[in-house]
Amino acid sequence: MTYPLLTRKTLMKKTPLALLLTLGLLQTPLAAFAATAPLDLVGPVSDYKIYVTENIEELVSHTQKFTDAVKKGDIATAKKLYAPTRVYYESVEPIAELFSDLDASIDSRVDDHEQGVAAEDFTGFHRLEYALFSQNTTKDQGPIADKLLSDVKDLEKRVADLTFPPEKVVGGAAALLEEVAATKISGEEDRYSHTDLYDFQGNIDGAKKIVDLFRPQIEQQDKAFSSKVDKNFATVDKILAKYKTKDGGFETYDKVKENDRKALVGPVNTLAEDLSTLRGKLGLN
């Protein structure tokens, strides 16, 4: 499914004023553009919307296959598809989280529910993860699978109509690293499947994409900052590469050595702190 409005070719046909309106850049106070002119943000924001749209299209496609396997009772296939499917959600989480109702339905963890796994509103990926990896069953999971697929399709529709706030886009890089620091390094995100490294990679890829798209604007303000961020991303990538499997996936998180977990803490926390200043550097606070 494609959205003509989101293609760069279509966007570039618009007048400068129309572009600013389409991408929400006139909703930002004029004082916010002390560091970066509004038109300088048009390209990065439009490209990021395309990136998010493409990832959500993949999310819908992969979720269809994942939920089909769950409904067929094919536990082995469902387990295999669980983590690779989630990557597409994790990479665009800052935008997905703008729809709090869907985020809670798609990605809430057992800790978010007072009644735990018995809670009626505990749905989505992690509820299916619990059934597949903790209980080793797909029994009675059909309705949850159907709801997950319905929710990601709803997300796709909402994102297509969304005006991307530039401050949310830029702030998303830090949000993704904070997510890694808070739940990925500890291994609590995917506690039943231990597939946290997939989520980890999705968060890192999403943050890198934002940095890369805004790189010209960042380097115009602070070239040393850009180099420091790249160095810390490279450190994280080097550690993650140790645990990649031949099929392009990752080892389970319980196989990550303690010294590597500790080695990830420094660069991840530094990235989260540094990227939290990015909005200010671009005048988007």
Curated annotation (Swiss-Prot):
GO terms for cellular component: periplasmic space. CDD domains: Imelysin-like_EfeO. It is found in: Periplasm. GO terms for biological process: iron ion transport. Keywords: Ion transport, Iron, Iron transport, Metal-binding, Periplasm, Signal, Transport. Residues 1-34 form the signal peptide. GO terms for molecular function: metal ion binding. The keyword DNA-binding does not apply. The keyword Transport applies. Component of the iron transporter efeUOB/M complex composed of EfeU, EfeM and EfeB. The peptidase M75 domain contains 2 metal binding sites, site III and site IV. Lacks the N-terminal Cup-like domain present in EfeO proteins that contains metal binding sites I and II. Belongs to the EfeM/EfeO family. Part of the iron transporter system efeUOB/M involved in iron import. Specifically binds Fe(3+), which is produced by EfeB-mediated oxidation of Fe(2+), and delivers it to the cell inner membrane permease EfeU. Also binds Zn(2+) and Cu(2+) in vitro. This is Iron uptake system component EfeM.
